[in-house]
Regions:
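Generic beta-sheet signal
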Residues: 11, 30, 73, 215-216
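Short gly/Ser/Thr-rich phosphate-binding loop of adenylate-forming enzymes
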Residues: 14
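Active-site phosphate-binding strand-loop segment of PLP-dependent enzymes
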Residues: 1-11
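ALDH superfamily catalytic-core signature
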Residues: 17-151
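Conserved C-terminal structural/oligomerization subdomain of aldehyde/semialdehyde dehydrogenase
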Residues: 136-221
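Short glycine-enriched loop/turn motifs at secondary-structure junctions
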Residues: 2, 31-32, 63-66, 114, ...
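Structural motif
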Residues: 9, 38, 71, 165-167, ...
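Short, structured coil segments at secondary-structure junctions
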Residues: 3-4, 23-24, 208-209
Length: 221
């Protein structure tokens, strides 16, 4: 409210943004995000895996630009997962994923509803989450808990803000790109793609229309 402050730059969640908007000053504020990353069959898979783990695990995924869900073309999905495991991701089994979801998601997201994570797990280490939510011991330096799910799963639609990364398979890159638009909820915040196909790179950039769009790199670069 200081008289010499004419503009507020705010991030940190809807509560903080709402408070800033009530100050009767100009406001630049960051909105919600659920950044998808698409990986197609032309991508450099080892590099894509390294970049995704690096980006999605940055500050335990609490940063809103971090990769939140992986949408991968079926033909390279297994290779991508194997490469991600080389960089500190630990894949969970289906039963573990469902137990984890019930614990770390307070309000399951879906099409048209962004949902909400359980704040008790936001920003926690992957090893802590595995231990507390599943009673599972994983290496303390685990960077991500990798969860292969179907495309309608709440983990795809909910911004977790923790090192829990859902992955879903798609028949084609175009199908994955179209789904990326949906699960990002139209926030137009952040999205990324790993591909050597220029037409796909351009198409995703246009249809996502995000403030931040990354091609063949991690979102924090």
């Amino acid at each position: 409210d200081h008289a010499m402050v004419s503009i507020l730059v705010v991030t940190g969640g809807p509560g903080v943004v709402r408070a800033a908007m009530q100050r009767h000053k100009k406001v630049i504020a960051a909105g919600p995000g659920n950044p998808p990353v698409v990986v197609d069959e032309t991508a450099d898979i080892p590099k894509a895996a390294k970049d995704i783990v690096a980006g999605a695990s940055l500050d335990n995924n609490i940063i809103c630009i971090d990769e939140k869900e992986v949408l991968v073309v079926e033909s390279v999905a297994d290779q991508l997962k194997a490469e991600m495991e080389k960089h500190g991701a630990v894949e969970l089994a289906s039963e573990q994923i469902e137990r984890l979801t019930k614990t770390v998601i307070a309000d399951p997201g879906r099409r048209g509803h962004e949902g909400m994570a359980n704040k008790a797990f936001v920003g926690k280490d992957a090893a802590y989450i595995a231990r507390e939510a599943l009673g599972l011991a994983v290496p303390e330096d685990t960077r991500l808990l990798l969860c292969e799910v179907d495309r309608g799963h709440p983990l795809i639609w909910t911004e977790q803000l923790m090192p829990v990364l859902p992955l879903a398979r798609f028949s084609t890159a175009d199908e994955a790109i179209d789904y990326a638009v949906e699960c990002e909820h139209g926030f137009r915040h952040t999205a990324s793609i790993h591909s050597k196909n220029v037409e796909r790179l351009s198409r995703m950039a246009k249809v996502m229309n995000c403030s931040l769009f990354v091609k063949n790199g991690s979102n924090y670069n």
